[in-house]
């Protein structure tokens, strides 16, 4: 069986990646492709337990503890869902993956980047996305979108939604840096464009990936 594709969507809070991941999956299924949509943290049984601690703003975590939690989640995710899904020939779409760890814990929290990358390599077991789409917008825009989305609804802001604006600006810098470091893998799309335009640009990037494999 031919190997599938591993695609990740990344971005700051409120960038629209979760919505676009679902839209991309629908578009690819309409083309007759087998698709799995997943997310980090929390899309395994162990991950669900980790996610509760990881995102709870009332639990004080040392930066190393925070990092190791998300990496434990990733190790389970790779073993249980990501690698089996791709090896079975699916297009696997993950809402967040390793670039989020570099952006949030590395750039946002200031954890040592070389060490973080080494630990991330252990968690991923060398599984690298075929394509990463970063939905980019200023941190101010993303936070405003997040607050507008939950306006009038019962919502408890998680550990990262509760962070100060400067933290989210550093996180954005981390995602932009990833695109500069690995331009072949990481593509930036302006998420301030219309929903339809963003959708079209994501699908075009994915089609380019698939067509390149077929050449």
How does the language model describe each region?
Residues 101-173:
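A glycine- and Lys/Arg-enriched "phosphate-lid" helix/loop adjacent to the NTP-binding pocket
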Residues 12:
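P-loop (Walker A) phosphate-binding loop of NTP-binding proteins
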Residues 1-5:
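Extreme N-terminal, non-catalytic leader segments
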Residues 23-25, 140-215:
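NTP-dependent small-molecule kinase module
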Residues 20:
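Hydrophobic positions on the alpha1 helix immediately C-terminal to the Walker A/P-loop
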Residues 9:
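Hydrophobic anchor at the beta1->P-loop junction of P-loop NTPases
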Residues 27, 33-124, 201:
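ATP-dependent small-molecule kinase phosphotransfer cores
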Residues 17:
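Conserved lysine of the Walker
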